[in-house]
C-alpha cells in the first residue's frame, strides 16, 4: 500500500484531503453490503460515472476538466461531488454526479454557465431537456412494493419526463415501470427512493451523452 501511495502522489493528496471519508467509507460499505444480503437487497454497481449535462461525454470532460470546482461549490442541488476513482486515476477530483444528497434540477444550467475550461459547454434549458446523461435502471426485487406489499411511487412522482410511471402490480398495488429511452438522467428517482442500503432504482451513466 505504501508503495502505491509513493508512486501516486495524487492519491496521497486525496487521502489527506478526505481522511475521515476514506476511513469511514470502507467499513460502512462493507456493513451495508452485509445488511443488504441479510435483508435480501440486491446491490447495484454503476458501470459508468455520470458527467454533468453539457460535458458531451466522459472522455471530453476528462480531457478538459481541471477540477477547479466552481461547478461543485455553486451547484444548488449539491449533486456534483469531487470524484475518487469513478473516472479512473486520471480523473481523480473531477466532478461527478452523485444523487445521495440531491438530484439535478430539470431546468438548472448553472454548471454549464460557469465552467471556465469548456469541460461543460453552455446549454439552454431546452437543450438540457433533450440531453440524456444517463438512463434509469429498476431492480424490482429491491422495491418496497415487491418486498413489503406497500404502495410507494416516490420515483414516478419526481420524474420530469415520465420515464418512470406506476402500473398495476398485484393486490391493488402499483409498481414502477421504466422507459430508459426518455430518461434524461436527472437522478430524481434515485434520490427519493426510500430503500436502503441498496436502492431499487438507479441512474446508469452514458459514456457519451445522447440527444
Model-derived features: where do they sit?
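Non-ligating segments of multi-cofactor redox enzymes
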Residues: 1-211
Amino acid at each position: 500500500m505504501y508503495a502505491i501511495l509513493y508512486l501516486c502522489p495524487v492519491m496521497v493528496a486525496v487521502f489527506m484531503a478526505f481522511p475521515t471519508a476514506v476511513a469511514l467509507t470502507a467499513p460502512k460499505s462493507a456493513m451495508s453490503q452485509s445488511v443488504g444480503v441479510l435483508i435480501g437487497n440486491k446491490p447495484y454497481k454503476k458501470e459508468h460515472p455520470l458527467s454533468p449535462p453539457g460535458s458531451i461525454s466522459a472522455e471530453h470532460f476528462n480531457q478538459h476538466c481541471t477540477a477547479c470546482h466552481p461547478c461543485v461549490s455553486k451547484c444548488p442541488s449539491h449533486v456534483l461531488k469531487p470524484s475518487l476513482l469513478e473516472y479512473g486515476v486520471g480523473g481523480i477530483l473531477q466532478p461527478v454526479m452523485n444523487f445521495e444528497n440531491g438530484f439535478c434540477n430539470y431546468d438548472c444550467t448553472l454548471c454549464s454557465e460557469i465552467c471556465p475550461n469548456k469541460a461543460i459547454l453552455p446549454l439552454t434549458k431546452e437543450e438540457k431537456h433533450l440531453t440524456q446523461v444517463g438512463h434509469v435502471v429498476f431492480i424490482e426485487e429491491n422495491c418496497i412494493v415487491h418486498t413489503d406489499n406497500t404502495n410507494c411511487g416516490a420515483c414516478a412522482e419526481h420524474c420530469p419526463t415520465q420515464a418512470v410511471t406506476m402500473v398495476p402490480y398485484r393486490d391493488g398495488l402499483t409498481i414502477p415501470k421504466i422507459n430508459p429511452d426518455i430518461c434524461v438522467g436527472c437522478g430524481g428517482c434515485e434520490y427519493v427512493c426510500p430503500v436502503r442500503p441498496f436502492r431499487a432504482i438507479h441512474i446508469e451513466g452514458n459514456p457519451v451523452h445522447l440527444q
